[in-house]
Each structure stands twice: as structure tokens, then as C-alpha cells.
Amino acid sequence: MSIALKQVFNKDKTFRPKRKFEPGTQRFELHKRAQASLNSGVDLKAAVQLPSGEDQNDWVAVHVVDFFNRINLIYGTICEFCTERTCPVMSGGPKYEYRWQDDLKYKKPTALPAPQYMNLLMDWIEVQINNEEIFPTCVGVPFPKNFLQICKKILCRLFRVFVHVYIHHFDRVIVMGAEAHVNTCYKHFYYFVTEMNLIDRKELEPLKEMTSRMCH
């Protein structure tokens, strides 16, 4: 990553502190392995495959946290251009509108401006990944039985951030010289969720054409 790009993707651009794994734990080692997959020249399609002998839930957990951090960072770089005026509804072009529901304040799917949707989304994901009953940090503590279902919901909603950024704000990404970095993050995400079967194909439709060109 160039110095200029590092300045674009700095920690001050994120909405919230990054969730990290404790050094010396198995998940920290898996996290480092997942991080290394973004090094230049790495075969991303191969890098996302579950390592031999490793637990699927551990592998998914470190990637969900990692993708949350990265996608939060990507949105943070363009959030000043994503306003209630420019994006009055959270959408991915004219065909796709995303409504928010959390069974708390928003018990029914509700149309919201994109920045409000994004803030609710990031807050909601942060609550999930900081919940020890869902993402246990202590070695030996089991994941809940519905862990993969929760992760599927998180990843499905994170994909919508990519959809919105690519369709409505990619001109800003290009101006910042961050196109290659965002594309690599997207490819990593796409290969992972399809390899692990974590997102329904119909949810991937908004970026299908771009994905077919980018992810062979």
C-alpha cells in the first residue's frame, strides 16, 4: 500500500475502535494467517479455504471480525460524501433498496437514509462481535449453536456496504487512489463468503456483473 493510501486508510477514519484478538491464542494465529492473505501475490481464492485441522467456527469468527474492521474503514473514507441529501435511502442503485430491522427500535423493515442505516449497522455488528456468548474470546469456550446463522446475517449486511459504496460512491474511491485496495478487500470477502457458503446467491445479485469480471 502506498504512503498516500495509508494516509487515506488511517485509524482515525474508522467510526469505532477495532475488535482485536489476544496475542498467543489460536484465534490470533488464525487472524494473522487471514491478514496475510491481503499481501500482494497471494492467491485469495486459495487463502480463504479452511486450513487443515482448524475449526470452521474459529476460521469464520476471525474473518467476520476482520471484514467488519476493513469494511468499516472503507466506509469511513467516504462517509463525508454519504449524507442524507446525497443518499436519502440506503440503496444499491434503482433496483435495490435495503431496509433496516433490528427487532428493537425498528421492529419492521424501515427505509432509512444511507448514513443512518450504516451507523445502525456498524453499531449492531459491534454488539454482536463484542458479545462473549456469540464470539467467545476464552479458549475452550464453545460457540453457540446458531453462530453461523448470526455470521451469515452479519456478512449479508456487510455486503450491502460494498454494494452502496461501489454503486454510489466509487468515484470518490477512485479520486483517493484507493480503487485497488477496495477491490482486493471485495475479492477477499467474495471468495470467503462463497467458499464457506455464508451468503445466498440472490443477495450477491447487485454486484453480479462486476464480480464476474473481477473474481474469476
Curated annotation (Swiss-Prot):
Entry's Gene Ontology molecular function annotations: metal ion binding; protein kinase activator activity
**Induced by what?**
Expression at transcriptional level is activated by the expression of the neighboring long non-coding RNA (lncRNA) EMICERI.
Keywords, ordered alphabetically: Metal-binding, Zinc
Which Gene Ontology BP terms does the record give?
Answer: regulation of hippo signaling; signal transduction
Q: Where does Zn(2+) bind?
A: 82, 87, 164, 169
The protein's matches in InterPro entries, at most eight in alphabetical order, are given as:
MOB_kinase_act_fam, MOB_kinase_act_sf
Does the record carry Metal-binding as a key word?
yes
Q: Can you tell which superkingdom this protein's organism belongs to? A: Eukaryota
* Parts of the chain that traverse the membrane: none
Annotated GO CC locations = cytoplasm; nucleus
Q: Which family does it belong to?
A: Belongs to the MOB1/phocein family.
Q: Briefly state the protein's biological role.
A: Modulates LATS1 expression in the Hippo signaling pathway which plays a pivotal role in organ size control and tumor suppression by restricting proliferation and promoting apoptosis.
- The protein's name: MOB kinase activator 3B
What species is given as this protein's source?
Homo sapiens
Gene, per the UniProt record: MOB3B
